[in-house]
């Protein structure tokens, strides 16, 4: 199911990339609430999906290489969401909420990158103590992302 969601999101994003773009093109948003809600929904799906895949890898149900492939796709999608937020040019009343959500996405992307580090450490049979340090950092990044999501929600007009 996770793979299906990731493929659907990836496919949809390619339509954006295949559309001819000029250098002065901008992403116009008129309903900032709906736009942020959509990004939040995609972010949640990606974060949940990658967490499930990460647990599968830690449990030995999937290989680190398979996990890395899924995580890189998810990270790319998070980057796409970051670009959408930046290019949306939120109105003054929505700016604080958008900036906090932007930080939540960045924390999630950092989290995904750290999970890739763990996958590579597992492939290389790294010392468990070193893996545990990175796992601790991953937990901190998850909490950081949640904190920014809460701040974004609180800052909504």
Where do the language-model regions lie?
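Hydrophobic membrane-insertion alpha-helices, especially the h-region
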Residues: 1-16
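Hydrophobic single-pass membrane-insertion segments
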Residues: 12-26
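C-terminal amphipathic alpha-helix
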Residues: 25-68, 104-157
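Helix-turn-helix repeat elements of alpha-solenoid scaffolds
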Residues: 73-77
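Short, solvent-exposed, charged loop/turn and helix-capping segments
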Residues: 78-102, 156-157
């Amino acid at each position: 199911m996770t793979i299906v969601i990731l493929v659907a999101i990836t496919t949809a994003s390619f339509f954006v990339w295949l559309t001819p773009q000029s250098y002065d093109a901008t992403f116009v948003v008129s309903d900032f609430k709906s736009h942020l809600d959509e990004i939040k929904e995609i972010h949640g799906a990606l974060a949940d999906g990658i967490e499930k895949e990460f647990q599968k890898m830690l449990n030995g149900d999937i290989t680190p290489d398979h996990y890395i492939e899924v995580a890189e796709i998810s990270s790319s999608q998070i980057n796409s969401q970051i670009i959408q937020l930046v290019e949306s040019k939120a109105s003054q009343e929505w700016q604080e909420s958008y900036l906090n959500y932007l930080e939540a996405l960045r924390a999630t992307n950092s989290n995904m990158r750290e999970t890739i580090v763990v996958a590579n450490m597992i492939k290389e049979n790294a010392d468990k103590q070193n893996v545990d340090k990175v796992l601790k950092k991953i937990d901190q990044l998850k909490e950081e992302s949640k904190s920014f999501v809460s701040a974004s929600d609180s800052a909504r007009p």
